Amino acid sequence: MDNQDRGSARTSRRQFISVAGLAATAVITLATSSTAGAAGPTAPNPGSRVGDPAEAQAVQRVAETLLNSGVPGLAFAIVKPDEKNRKASVTTTYHYGQADVENGVRVTPRTQFEIASETKTFTAALLAKLISRGEVGLDDLASKYSDGNPLPKGIGGEEITLRQLVTHRSGLSDDPPNLSAGCADPTRSCTDEKAKYTRNMLWKGLQDAGALEFAPGSHWLYSDFGFGLLGTLMADKIIPGQEKPPFAAAVAREITDPLGMMGTVIETKATDLAVPYHLDGTRAPLWNNTGAIAGGGGLVSTAEDMSIWAATTLGYGNNPLKPVLTSMLEQIDTQAPENPAFGMGMAWQLQPPTPNFPQRFAKKNGDSSGSNCITLLVPDSGWSITILANGGNAAMIDPAAVNLMHDLVPRQPIFGSSTGSSSGSDVGFQTGSFG
């Protein structure tokens, strides 16, 4: 990866996060006239599970806009209540465009996309599951699980807790200061620098003078470094004694296998991966965050799998993991002292109601050098929207999802109110057992 690839991913992600209220305070309208319609209606690829005409048309409008803006391939997953049984869910999926432009491979239900930072919700799930078993505590010091390796402290001796890691309040920088340590020239970034980043490099990076940007708990700063550390700590707790951090194995054993999410794996194990592309149409390098900070962004997934993830997090079904995933939507911290309206669950950012969309919702997005994704959850109505793309950027994909949310999700809660009462799937945004 070159500096441009790393910088573009970071910038687009940070822009969306730094204006967290934008999507909730104004209806975002996509440019669906002239350019989007120039090629005529775009039908979803074979294998799509299409919803009612109104939904299908709304998705088609968004898909055409993105495809005509240079995104090669897309997958959508929408979860909503079953009209005949509001305690059950219905999933629709839509696949468009190409997973591999040069070889003419279309996006199908099997197509895997890099989900980058949406991986953080799976990392948080490892923590939530260990908490549910009484094996760790949310306010435990992270150093309790670092096998004797010291972690940085604030100038007043403040130590990092698991709560702070899972809510971006640890003070750790976005990327490790020594992220390029595995490159031939450690002073310059390189392709696969994340894959080459070992556990020993992680411990050394944590001792770097630039590792901690502020005292733990005092501010909010999005941190791949922090979630990478959390992923390694929790994976080592679950599967101890491994030479390499067992993040992928821990996620498979504890999370994805029990949910039947067979297409959600660490990137090196992907068999149907969509090729990521730059905005100019050239191939982008694989994100390949498969080393010691994989918990920050190392997984790939499919639209079908992400619908399972969203539905279970909303509280649908009877999988034993349901209470673990729904607990992650409980507010356990504010995003930042200067912006208390925007709360943090475990990895999920919690958005307040606004006049334009009078329901709270949770969001998590992800972007790599050439892939983008986002999932929005509206628990009090039992809806979710996921978009996966092998091109574009967060400034394109995130508003597209918000646009669909405004178009499709009822303005008023279906299950109770949007001020803290639980949804039909027993989920709310009130502070719960972790608060």
Task: Specify the residue positions occupied by each region the protein language model found.
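Twin-arginine (Tat) signal peptide motif
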Residues: 8-15, 35
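Short, conserved catalytic-motif segment at the N-terminal edge
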Residues: 52-113, 135-137, 152
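Short active-site loop at a secondary-structure junction
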Residues: 69-72, 102-165, 212-224, 294-297, ...
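Short, surface-exposed loop or secondary-structure junction motifs
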Residues: 86-100, 153-369, 373-374
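Short, gly/Ser/Thr-rich active-site loops of penicillin-recognizing serine hydrolases
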Residues: 339-340, 353-359, 391-435
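Short, well-ordered beta-strand elements
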Residues: 364, 372-391
